[in-house]
Amino acid sequence: MSTHSNHPFHLVDYSPWPLTGAIGAMTTVSGMVKWFHQYDISLFLLGNIITILTVYQWWRDVSREGTYQGLHTYAVTIGLRWGMILFILSEVLFFVSFFWAFFHSSLSPAIELGASWPPMGIISFNPFQIPLLNTAILLASGVTVTWAHHSLMESNHSQTTQGLFFTVLLGIYFTILQAYEYIEAPFTIADSVYGSTFYMATGFHGVHVLIGTTFLLVCLLRHLNNHFSKNHHFGFEAAAWYWHFVDVVWLFLYITIYWWGG
């Protein structure tokens, strides 16, 4: 690697993963647009495969740099922390756009929607059934990931394992319930602006839950291989930050779109 012990800066070798990641993202988005317009889904699936393979190999390299090569010095870790903070901030603004679209349409419904919200003919979800259960699941997962973090800080290996395991399990449970809700939904993404804003907001949140669950599963596997210590575990810390962000976004989704907007 390019980084040596005589300076703290984060210099890495040339890597193909930013390029393949950009290609994967472009292919995924292009394929999704074509899929939404009744074209074949194959381009979307190809983009997903490229992105998943890129993420796997990129994270593998980062784990090797930090765990086996000692490249994640204190100064490097500070840079990684700021990078994660700015990434989460960008994600906040990403979801603000969906809430903006929702409130723009719901606070003053157009005459084409029957001047009502939800629009005429739309049967919305009961917020006190599956959505409320999903809220409880995500709040519980926030507790378990915090339990795992505190256990790691106390060098309690078994309780860290249990906390991470239950968090991953709750994330999978949430995803299954969300998929069931979509399957049983009485409206589609094409059913007015209500369907569009509902599925875009909850769908992208669901994607973030899948990413967060994968992130935490990787942390669980790394923990089982003794990659973390109480003084060196930023990979886990970043996953916990991301998971708490997903929790908070869901609370806003539940209160605004499911409860107030339904």
From Swiss-Prot:
Domain of life: Eukaryota
Keywords noted in UniProt: Membrane, Mitochondrion, Mitochondrion inner membrane, Translocase, Transmembrane, Transmembrane helix
Membrane topology label: Multi-pass membrane protein
Residues making up the signal peptide according to the UniProt record: none
One GO biological process term: mitochondrial electron transport, cytochrome c to oxygen
Organism: Drosophila yakuba
Main location: mitochondrion
UniProt function note: Component of the cytochrome c oxidase, the last enzyme in the mitochondrial electron transport chain which drives oxidative phosphorylation. The respiratory chain contains 3 multisubunit complexes succinate dehydrogenase (complex II, CII), ubiquinol-cytochrome c oxidoreductase (cytochrome b-c1 complex, complex III, CIII) and cytochrome c oxidase (complex IV, CIV), that cooperate to transfer electrons derived from NADH and succinate to molecular oxygen, creating an electrochemical gradient over the inner membrane that drives transmembrane transport and the ATP synthase.
InterPro entries per record: Cyt_c/ubiquinol_Oxase_su3, Cyt_c_oxase_su3_dom, Cyt_c_oxidase-like_su3, Cyt_c_oxidase_su3-like_sf, Cyt_c_oxidase_su3_a-hlx
Pfam family, one: COX3
Catalysed conversion reaction: 4 Fe(II)-[cytochrome c] + O2 + 8 H(+)(in) = 4 Fe(III)-[cytochrome c] + 2 H2O + 4 H(+)(out)
The protein's name: Cytochrome c oxidase subunit 3
Lineage of origin: Eukaryota, Metazoa, Ecdysozoa, Arthropoda, Hexapoda
Similarity comment: Belongs to the cytochrome c oxidase subunit 3 family.
CC terms in the record's Gene Ontology section: mitochondrial inner membrane; respiratory chain complex IV
Oligomer status and interactors: Component of the cytochrome c oxidase (complex IV, CIV), a multisubunit enzyme composed of a catalytic core of 3 subunits and several supernumerary subunits. The complex exists as a monomer or a dimer and forms supercomplexes (SCs) in the inner mitochondrial membrane with ubiquinol-cytochrome c oxidoreductase (cytochrome b-c1 complex, complex III, CIII).
EC number: 7.1.1.9
Record flagged with keyword Metal-binding: no
Entry's localization field: Mitochondrion inner membrane
TM region(s), chain numbering: 39-59, 83-103, 120-140, 163-183, 201-221, 240-260
Gene Ontology molecular-function annotations: cytochrome-c oxidase activity
